[in-house]
């Protein structure tokens, strides 16, 4: 008797609505150059978002402050985990410059978790909001803050 393994050698194709084209286009290249040149991070790149090409071609991005290394190890997240670098206090100024270069009227800012900092990074959120408002007064700012480990004081710093 001969045993034959039976399995489908064809990989099931993802549905069209789930596939995203490789990031290309003039706006994508320009935003990539801005982010790289100003040493900024986006959740788009750090979390390996498949829609980065689409969003960046529409000149939208979610900035990620406080570095690109998270102090938590959430299994669902693609952001790098480990011991983060020191806080870069020039990051808010560079982010505001990037937002101006992108012509933003609405900026979205989030961050990695920084459980290594007493305020969880609240001070840098406040500095970033201030820098954007100072550089682009008409720009609205949305911040997606971490939980600050439940610290009301940290939240008040941001507000």
Locate predicted features.
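Flexible, acidic/Gly-rich N-terminal and inter-domain linker regions that tether
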Residues: 1-72
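Conserved Radical SAM active-site core
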Residues: 58-159
